Amino acid sequence: MSTVEVFNAQQIAELIDALATAIARDHPHLDRLVLIGIRTRGVPLAYRLRDRIATGFGSPPQVGELDITFFRDDLGSGGLRTPNRSELPRDLTGQEVVLVDDVLFRGRTVRAALEALNHFGRPEQVRLAVLIDRGHRQFPIQPDYCGHKLTTAPEQIVKVHLRETDGEERVLLIDAKLEENSRE
């Protein structure tokens, strides 16, 4: 059983460039676009997408940070959770929103994010951008923008490491049994 590096820093940058290009092409009115990163790793990805869009397409979209702590359906497991604050640049009514996250797996995080968004207005449209889509959905949720679709077994773990949160850049595919043994 092993840990495999799926993407390195350069490859992650290329995935982000492709995502930024696709988002900018679909949103010609960048002044109405709001990129909302889902805490934790969706936030630095949203800022990176903003910077890439600004560099390649002129006007930078606004960025927000969404905390979904109290909207998750697994609040009872894992002990007490401390919420962060959501920080959104404006009322989302009539805006084009792109939710940004690192990994899409079962769809529970995105479901919670959609529920949390209801407290900030009624966007014209909400789309989803993820760095990695690993499949195995429990909800009918699909990304509109996907950096890479990675085939995994349900028991495997995909970990995205970003310099802003982890001090390094890489995407790892980890065997779950190996991860469990390292926790004992």
Curated annotation (Swiss-Prot):
GO molecular function: uracil phosphoribosyltransferase activity
Species of origin: Synechococcus sp. (strain JA-3-3Ab)
EC primary class: transferase
Protein name: Bifunctional protein PyrR
Catalytic activity entry: UMP + diphosphate = 5-phospho-alpha-D-ribose 1-diphosphate + uracil
Family (UniProt): Belongs to the purine/pyrimidine phosphoribosyltransferase family. PyrR subfamily.
EC number(s) on file: 2.4.2.9
InterPro entries from the UniProt entry: PRibTrfase_dom, PRTase-like, PyrR, PyrR_bifunctional
